[in-house]
Amino acid sequence: MSQKHIDELSGVETTGHEWDGIQELNNPMPRWWIWTFYVTILWAIGYAIAYPAIPMITSATNGYLGYSTRAELQQDLNLAKSSQTEFHDLIAAKTVEEIDADPALRKFAIAGGASAFKVNCAPCHGSGASGGPGFPNLNDDDWLWGGDLNAIQATISHGIRFDGDTDSHSSEMPPFAGVLEPIQMKQVAAFVWGLTNTPSDVGLAAAGKQVFFDNCAPCHGEDAKGKVEMGAPDLADAIWLKSRGEDAILRQVASPKHGVMPAWAARLGDTTVNELTIFVHALGGGT
């Protein structure tokens, strides 16, 4: 048997360990601590009986109380949905102009539209709706297909160049690589860039004016401010959808790229489309 070590000062048995002359007393645990430990064991057993706790092969024990966090969540969702039913019904039934004119409905629609935007639109247009190369900035006042409430609603509902919707906006700029000479494409690129910036070659830009009038003005207008009815962009506002610079313009003239936006009406429904319309219009660029 091992010899017991007794502390001379207190008369209490020690653990037998010593660190730099310091010994640890082997006092028993307090009674209250022991009873607390027993209570926690009983509480754990009771919890395992009352609540889902024990994992099985394909499921788990349901517990005596039948509690479920998923059921609780569904109950909360149903409660939240029922409290919003009146607003949702009104938003689905009214026109976007009527919604925008009603302060309470407009506030509710903007909140709902912001939520729907983050889920459905932000992957392309960005969380702040500022867009990116090939994806329009929705905060400015430059709109290919119109920026009033009805125009925004139509674009969201039917999309752009979306094959699954016959009412989708559709416009295509033809490739001019086989129509114009290389020098002519450089001239018109310099001219377009020169509308808002200093062209790299003033002579090229001057010659490109006539090339523009002959080939581009029918869609973009003689003033190069675009035509909403055709989805032709304004080339005189220094806002660029694809990228900036004469080289970028030259590439677009030679072999244009066309973006596609899905039609959201069938996927989201009238209520969410109307909410998105109000939200996008309220970003600041709506006309």
Curated annotation (Swiss-Prot):
Q: How does it sit in the membrane?
A: Single-pass membrane protein
Mention one GO molecular function. Answer: oxidoreductase activity
Q: Could you list which ranges are Cytoplasmic topological domains?
A: 1-33
One Gene Ontology term from the biological process aspect of the record: proton transmembrane transport
Q: Which residues cross the membrane?
A: 34-54
The record's comment on cofactor binding reads:
Binds 2 heme C groups per subunit.
**Which ranges of this chain reside in the Periplasmic compartment per its record?**
55-287
| Domain of life of the source | Bacteria
Query: InterPro entries from the xrefs?
Result: CcoP_N, CcoP_N_sf, Cyt_c-like_dom, Cyt_c-like_dom_sf, Cyt_C_IC, Cyt_c_oxidase_cbb3_su3, Cytochrome_c_Oxidase_Subunit
Q: Where in the cell is it found?
A: Cell inner membrane
Q: Which residues bind heme c 2?
A: 173, 216, 219-220
The cofactor(s) it depends on are:
heme c
Q: Mind naming one GO cellular-component term on file for this protein?
A: plasma membrane
Which residues are recorded as binding heme c 1?
121, 124-125, 261
The principal localisation class reads: membrane
Q: Which keywords, in A-to-Z order, does the entry hold?
A: Cell inner membrane, Cell membrane, Electron transport, Heme, Hydrogen ion transport, Ion transport, Iron, Membrane, Metal-binding, Oxidoreductase, Plasmid, Repeat, Respiratory chain, Transmembrane, Transmembrane helix, Transport
Role, per record: C-type cytochrome. Part of the cbb3-type cytochrome c oxidase complex. FixP subunit is required for transferring electrons from donor cytochrome c via its heme groups to FixO subunit. From there, electrons are shuttled to the catalytic binuclear center of FixN subunit where oxygen reduction takes place. The complex also functions as a proton pump.
By sequence similarity, the record places it as follows: Belongs to the CcoP / FixP family.
Q: Which PANTHER family match?
A: CBB3-TYPE CYTOCHROME C OXIDASE SUBUNIT FIXP
Name of the protein in question: Cbb3-type cytochrome c oxidase subunit FixP
Name the gene.
fixP
